[in-house]
């Protein structure tokens, strides 16, 4: 081998191992440094954890001390409060003991005073007994002396004295009652007049007067013959379909429809006008026209009922009630349209209710429905108050509304104030001038009844009904009747009217006692 090459190889191996040794030494040095760094970091983490643990431990100790101090302070306060309560209880107990001792002392004093009073009272009772015995002796002596002087016994004198006292008392009572009646009458009349006038002035209504017949114009007499038909078949078919009487006489241009049922009469009138306008008049056409007119009248009835309810601001009515309300448009009472009368009563009752602090809406509802029974009294038994009350009860109306319909003519005991309001409004609507009219025979009979009732009473000389029966003037004798007796006669006559007569509004009774003294100068 070449010595130079071998030397070169040796040098190369030497430096190679030397490099490896250097690298290993470097790696070892880096590993040592990393381990030292990790040890330092671990030491730092341990130190930080140790410091944090110390800090938390100190905080826990501080919190525990604060809680302990708070608990101790609370316990101290409770102990102090209990001590204070105990002291207050002790003071109250001491005060009550003092009061008890004082009360016992007062009781002993009162007992001593009572014993002293009983002793004095016993002495006074003995004196009083002696004085009473002496007084009885003196009274007996006086009675014997009075009986001897007057010639009357004790019983006779007492009876005469009682009669005198009774007469004086009756005179005083009559004067007092008369005075208070006049004052009360003035106040009540003034308040009632103001309330009624205010309500009536705030509302004014138009009333229509209907009869039991309706007239229908015909263009020619030939049309009358067509209405009658061959052998009267058309008129018989018409009367059978409508339930009314058709009167055809010599009156030119007029045919009269007569019937007591206003709804049927209106259906007949409308049907006849349609037949005359159409010109075709035969039984089948009559039946068709009457059926159509009946439907139109039914719709008109519902419309009238809804209009009346809306006019007085009443809502929530049953369909049957609205229908019956609309039927009142065709009903009259003493020539007064019942539907307009019901609307007027509703307004008057509502205004009066609001004046005295009641529910105006409920009063208007009661007033509107009070005469609802008049629309069905031809179909059911009983008077219209009972029929109307039954209908409203079945329609789920309030008790106030049902009672107002049943009792607005004073036929039952009044349970609700709305019944009296409706009765008052009903009387106002019926009795105002021009609202109703009655026959001459009925008018004369009512005047005679008023005068005959007044003539029943002793001391009445003459009686005159004036102002269309709204007032009665009674003349009494001044020798037979005193002022107090005249006032009693006036009350009795008014009470008799209320019990025996039925009348709208009120009747004023005036008793006149006149004394005349005549002398002649010569």
Curated annotation (Swiss-Prot):
Q: Could you name the domain of life of the organism this protein comes from?
A: Bacteria
Which parts of the sequence belong to the KH domain? Answer: 212-272
Q: What's a GO biological-process term for it?
A: mRNA catabolic process
Compartments, record wording: Cell membrane
* PROSITE patterns with a match to the protein in the record: HD (PS51831), KH_TYPE_1 (PS50084)
From the UniProt record, which GO molecular function terms apply? RNA binding; RNA endonuclease activity
HD domain: from which residue to which, for each copy? 338-431
- Where are the bilayer-spanning segments? 7-27
Alphabetical list of InterPro entries matching this protein? HD/PDEase_dom (IPR003607), HD_domain (IPR006674), HDIG_dom (IPR006675), KH_dom (IPR004087), KH_dom_type_1 (IPR004088), KH_dom_type_1_sf (IPR036612), Ribonuclease_Y (IPR017705), RNase_Y_N (IPR022711)
Going by the record, the broad EC class of this enzyme is hydrolase
Q: Which HAMAP family match?
A: RNase_Y
Q: Which NCBIfam families match?
A: HDIG (TIGR00277), RNase_Y (TIGR03319)
Q: What is this protein called?
A: Ribonuclease Y
């Amino acid at each position: 081998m070449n010595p130079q090459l071998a030397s070169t190889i040796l040098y190369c191996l030497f430096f190679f191992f030397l490099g490896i040794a250097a690298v290993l030494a470097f790696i070892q040095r880096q590993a040592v440094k990393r381990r030292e760094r990790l040890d330092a970091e671990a030491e730092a983490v341990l130190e930080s954890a140790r410091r944090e643990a110390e800090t938390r431990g100190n905080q826990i100790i501080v919190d525990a001390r604060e809680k302990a101090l708070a608990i101790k302070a609370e316990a101290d306060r409770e102990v102090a409060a209990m001590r204070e309560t105990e002291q207050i209880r002790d003071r109250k107990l001491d005060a009550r003991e003092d009061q008890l001792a004082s009360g016992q002392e007062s009781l002993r004093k009162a007992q001593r005073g009572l014993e002293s009073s009983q002793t004095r009272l016993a002495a006074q009772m003995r004196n009083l007994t002696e004085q009473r015995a002496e007084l009885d002796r003196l009274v007996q002596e006086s009675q014997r002396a009075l009986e001897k002087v007057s010639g009357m016994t004790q019983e006779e004198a007492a009876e005469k004295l009682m009669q005198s006292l009774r007469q004086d008392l009756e005179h005083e009572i009559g004067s007092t009652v008369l005075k208070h009646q006049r004052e009360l009458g003035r106040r009540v009349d003034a308040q009632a007049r103001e309330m009624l006038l205010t309500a009536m002035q705030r509302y004014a209504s138009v009333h229509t007067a209907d009869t039991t017949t309706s007239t229908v114009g015909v263009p020619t007499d030939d049309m009358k013959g067509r209405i009658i038909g061959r052998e009267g078949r058309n008129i018989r078919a018409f009367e059978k379909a409508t339930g009314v009487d058709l009167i055809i006489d010599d009156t030119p241009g007029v045919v009269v429809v007569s019937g007591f049922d206003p709804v049927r009469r209106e259906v007949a009138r409308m049907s006849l006008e349609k037949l005359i306008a159409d010109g075709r008049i035969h039984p089948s056409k009559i039946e068709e026209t009457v059926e159509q007119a009946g439907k139109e009248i039914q719709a008109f009835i519902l419309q009238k009922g809804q209009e009346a309810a809306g006019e007085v601001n009443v809502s929530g009515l049953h369909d049957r009630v609205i229908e019956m309300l609309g039927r009142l448009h065709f009903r009259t009472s003493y020539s007064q349209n019942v539907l307009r009368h019901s609307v007027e009563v509703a307004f008057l009752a509502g205004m009066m209710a609001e004046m005295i602090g009641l529910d105006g809406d409920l009063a208007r509802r009661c007033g509107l429905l009070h005469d609802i029974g008049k629309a069905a009294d031809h179909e059911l038994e009983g008077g219209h108050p009972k029929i109307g009350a039954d209908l409203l009860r079945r329609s789920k109306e309030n008790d106030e509304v049902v009672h107002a319909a049943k009792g607005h003519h004073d036929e039952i005991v009044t349970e609700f104030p709305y019944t009296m309001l409706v009765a008052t409004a009903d009387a106002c609507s019926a009795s105002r001038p021009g609202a109703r009219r009655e026959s001459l025979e009925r008018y004369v009979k009512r005047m005679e009844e008023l005068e005959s009732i007044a003539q029943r009473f002793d001391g009445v000389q003459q009686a005159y009904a004036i102002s269309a029966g709204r007032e009665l003037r009674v003349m009494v004798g001044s020798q037979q009747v005193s002022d107090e007796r005249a006032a009693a006669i006036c009350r009795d006559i008014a009470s008799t009217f209320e019990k025996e007569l039925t009348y709208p509004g009120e009747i004023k009774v005036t008793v006149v006692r006149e004394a005349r003294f005549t002398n002649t100068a010569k």
